[in-house]
């Protein structure tokens, strides 16, 4: 496939290519990376690093998402939630999706390596491989703990953002990593619980299918309590202040409450409500981190 053909296809089917990028997920990824950038310095992150770092990390995340679509095509075709995606419907071919994923990935590496720094480029590449290939192709079909074992790649964005600005790794960046890492299982298992009948038709051994509803709910509650504790670490380590602490307690308390309600009253509606709140929770928690970091400077 020539470059001209790819460009023409992208212009014609741009909505389908956008779906391949999983824009909602990538938006959250990019936001947490941006928070990592700004928390890494006392003042504002340099505009050049902010611009190209955000672009490069976003393109890398979109590339991994497109690879995920490629590998998940057969499973997507039998699930109501994903049957309308570009590959199962034939709106895009596998060749188009692969060329798109490669183009995004190469663009990400070039931007990050030459316009940001090599460390961020290599870490982003590792994250792309971790999510797009290791998790999707190997862990996801192999074990019910796939989301736990593969969660590291999805938790990397704040580390990438931090490295983009400072050119180094820092323990505070890994506190942000740990929050997302522990957040991922209850977030995903709430969705899997609501869609357990659909997942039972795929090759993937999702926890509600292999271990049952009650065990899955128990794990969701346990991980959410663990997340509540982990979310306090930025305050305990003096990385963040009282404003963040109040936000973390309020947001975490609501998350714990929803999971307990779900544990006592199983329903797909409650599972989806918990899943939806988990997204709001993570975005709001990182917003509190950002506001807490800068608000004292304006008071």
Curated annotation (Swiss-Prot):
One of its GO terms (cellular component) is plasma membrane. The keyword Transmembrane applies. Keywords: Cell inner membrane, Cell membrane, Heme biosynthesis, Membrane, Transferase, Transmembrane, Transmembrane helix. Its EC number is 2.5.1.141. It is found in: Cell inner membrane. It is a multi-pass membrane protein. CDD domains: PT_UbiA_Cox10. Signal peptide: none annotated. Converts heme B (protoheme IX) to heme O by substitution of the vinyl group on carbon 2 of heme B porphyrin ring with a hydroxyethyl farnesyl side group. This is Protoheme IX farnesyltransferase. It comes from Nitrosococcus oceani (strain ATCC 19707 / BCRC 17464 / JCM 30415 / NCIMB 11848 / C-107). The lineage of its organism: Bacteria, Pseudomonadati, Pseudomonadota, Gammaproteobacteria, Chromatiales.
């Amino acid at each position: 496939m020539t470059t001209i053909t790819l460009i023409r296809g992208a212009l014609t089917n741009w909505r389908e290519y956008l779906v391949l990028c999983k824009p909602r997920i990538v938006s959250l990824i990019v936001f947490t990376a941006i928070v990592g950038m700004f928390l890494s310095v006392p003042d504002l992150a340099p505009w050049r690093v902010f611009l190209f770092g955000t672009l490069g990390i976003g393109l890398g995340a979109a590339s991994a998402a497109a690879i995920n679509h490629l590998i998940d095509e057969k499973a997507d075709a039998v699930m109501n939630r994903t049957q309308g995606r570009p590959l199962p419907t034939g709106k895009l071919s596998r060749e188009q999706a692969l060329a798109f994923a490669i183009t995004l990935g190469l663009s990400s590496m070039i931007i990050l390596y030459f316009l940001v720094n090599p460390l961020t480029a290599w870490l982003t590449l590792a994250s792309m491989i971790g999510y797009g290939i290791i998790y999707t192709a190997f862990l996801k079909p192999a074990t019910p703990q796939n989301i736990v074992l593969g969660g590291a790649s999805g938790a990397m964005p704040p580390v990438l953002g931090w490295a983009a600005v400072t050119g180094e790794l820092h323990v505070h960046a890994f506190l942000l990593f740990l929050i997302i890492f522990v957040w991922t299982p209850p977030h995903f298992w709430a969705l899997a619980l609501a869609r357990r009948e659909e997942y039972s038709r795929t090759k993937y051994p999702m926890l509600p299918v292999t271990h049952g509803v009650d065990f899955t709910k128990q794990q969701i509650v346990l991980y959410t309590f663990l997340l509540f504790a982990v979310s306090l670490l930025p305050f305990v380590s003096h990385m963040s202040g009282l404003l963040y602490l109040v936000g973390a307690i309020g947001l975490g308390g609501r998350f714990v409450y929803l999971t307990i309600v779900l544990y006592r009253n199983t329903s797909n509606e409650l599972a989806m409500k918990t899943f939806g709140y988990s997204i709001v929770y993570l975005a709001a928690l990182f917003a509190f981190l950002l506001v807490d970091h800068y608000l004292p400077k304006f008071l």
